[in-house]
Amino acid sequence: MIRKAFVMQVNPDSHDEYERRHTPIWPELESVLKDHGAHHYAIYLDKARNLLFATVEIESEERWNAVAHTDVCQRWWKHMRDVMPSNPDNSPVSAELKEVFYLD
């Protein structure tokens, strides 16, 4: 498994709405993530900094990157763009983090 971590932001007035939309995520999005090899996906909210911290374990970079090209992911991004900073293609503005320590 490949461990990934990344950060995103949520609009200051959208914390509750962001959480509501993830409780739960759409079943078809969950299926696509699992079908593309995503495991142990978690998102944490730092309300003081409007920061989202996400971790996920993936089976391959290619399968993970393919999620972005699915219809359900495109619809999800469009659904979320009003609660978080987004790129022109509606994907969330995010930054991948480098792992510097891991204890198994």
From Swiss-Prot:
User: Where does the chain bind substrate?
Assistant: 18, 41, 76-77
Which keywords describe this protein according to UniProt? Carbohydrate metabolism, Cytoplasm, Isomerase, Rhamnose metabolism
A GO BP entry is: rhamnose catabolic process
The record, for InterPro entries, names:
Dimeric_a/b-barrel, L-rhamnose_mutarotase, Rham/fucose_mutarotase
Q: Which Pfam families match?
A: rhaM
According to its UniProt record, which reaction does this protein catalyse?
alpha-L-rhamnose = beta-L-rhamnose
EC number assigned by the record: 5.1.3.32
The coiled-coil regions, if any, are none
Molecular function in Gene Ontology: L-rhamnose mutarotase activity
Q: Which top EC class is named for this enzyme in its record? A: isomerase
User: HAMAP family attached here?
Assistant: L_rham_rotase
The UniProt subunit note reads as follows: Homodimer.
Family to which this protein belongs: Belongs to the rhamnose mutarotase family.
Instruction: Indicate what this protein is called per its UniProt record.
Output: L-rhamnose mutarotase
The organism's taxonomic lineage, starting at the top: Bacteria, Pseudomonadati, Pseudomonadota, Gammaproteobacteria, Enterobacterales
